[in-house]
Swiss-Prot record:
Forms part of the ribosomal stalk which helps the ribosome interact with GTP-bound translation factors. Is thus essential for accurate translation. Belongs to the bacterial ribosomal protein bL12 family. GO terms for molecular function: structural constituent of ribosome. InterPro entries: Ribosomal_bL12_oligo, Ribosomal_bL12_oligo_N_sf. One of its GO terms (cellular component) is ribosome. Keywords: Ribonucleoprotein, Ribosomal protein. It comes from Clostridium pasteurianum. Disulfide bonds: none annotated. This is Large ribosomal subunit protein bL12. The keyword Acetylation does not apply.
Amino acid sequence: MSKEQIIQAIKGMTVLELNELVKSIEEEFGVSAAAPV
């Protein structure tokens, strides 16, 4: 899957789906996507 394909998939998602995607990525890689303050 290319970066372009990933971007196209994300563009078709709802805000709720994106939120769930971010949570899944955080859990998978043990990281947080929260911006440092």
